[in-house]
Amino acid sequence: VKRFFECLFLVLSLAVFPTHVKAQDAFTTTRDYVTQFYPLWFTYYQTSFGTVNQLSGPNRITPIYHYVVAINDDTIYATSVLDLSMEPVILTIPSTPANYSVLTLDRYNDIFHSALPDNTPGTYALYGPGFDPDRLPSKITPIRLPINYMTLIFRADKFKLVDGVEQDLTSEADTFRRNMTMVPVCAYLGQNCPAGVPPGGPTRIFPEIVFALPFKAIADKLIARDPIAFLRQLQTAVKGPATPPMSPEVKRLSEHFDALFATSTLNQRPEFASGAQTAHELITEDYLTHIDGTNWISYKNIGYWCHNPDNFHACTNPDPGSSLAIQRSSITEYIQYANDHEAAAYFHAFKDGDDIPLDGTDPDGYVLTFSRKKLPATKRFWSLTAYTPDAIELVPNSADKYLVASYTPDLKKNADGSISIYMARKLPPGVPPANWLPIPRGPFNVMLRDYGPLENVLDGTYVPPRIEKIR
């Protein structure tokens, strides 16, 4: 009898997990699946709360806002979830004295340079593949998008340098955002629209609390505590209609994971869980170790993860398990919806120049000094923002101050022409308020942005100065 049950246990064990190879396959496939499709989890669930074929944005940006990772307060936002599968949309952009930029992305956050220009008012028709542009109204500029489901983001600058003086155009930028309209072509022509076509209209402005859902924190906690639940949610996102077309290699990965996961048993779940958690470790490690000699993290290829970046219509996803796939996911984890390097350069620091993690426990804080020749070359502006350690969101502070920028009113230069930014919990004695960036009591990180990079920032050779601990 004992021998019978020993044999039965062996047979059942082999049926549940026939070989070590199957366990390894579950682990590696899950690891590659998560690193490949990680951005889709974010965009699938974020866009389910977004306005479809209509621009929208928060009434203001404060630490309550958690919707997008590494949000900043130096521009005014308007965003639309585009679904062109039923009807093109007519986008009307008014004139404004404020500078603004346009960003168009797919659900992976791959960037598509459409013909929709920055700083150019007009009426544009956005249409997807399969639509005949000859059917569009005359005197409207047609803009073809490579796929039907994309995200459109406008960023309007609050300040503008005019004759050497920074002009506050916050009100004008907000008016510009509110006056943009997006409607289906049928409504534009005064026709009855098919059922299910979003009506569109002017930009909708929502209270910031609407954007409080912390997607990054949710993803991080799910992977750490319930990776199987995260995998099920990721499967739902991957199978969503807005997922861009897959290359044969990526499609095989998706189908192979689905088959393994569907036939797995409870005894096999640890391999899937371990694969998901290892993928998350790879994603975070890639970002946090992508540093230069002064401990600033910087990527020069943001948005260009596909095999054919010069032709988005022929774009295919990076190979499963490749460094590009991991990099794309790491950008989603730490600086979602980032511009490409030509539009904006990003430098992110979690450590000071001595390789010690940034921590605001010591009240003396830190200083970042740009020599006159080390200021980021820019045609728009540069800014420095402090963030919380895990969610990468704005730091709550009594001053309601979240950045120091080249346009900050009353920003003071040192006698030699350099600029020092002081990072501390409270305004240090003798420091001009404009040069102070509030930080939390405990770990934090800072991001330097250059909108419209020039010279050595644009060519990728610029390295920001060290962050120094004040002693």
Region spans (language model):
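Positively charged n-region of N-terminal signal peptides that target proteins for export
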Residues: 1-4
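Bacterial N-terminal signal peptides
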Residues: 6-16
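Hydrophobic alpha-helical segments
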Residues: 16-17, 117
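Sec/Tat signal peptide C-region and signal peptidase I cleavage site
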Residues: 17-23
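A compositional/structural signature for long, glycine/proline-rich flexible linkers
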Residues: 23-471
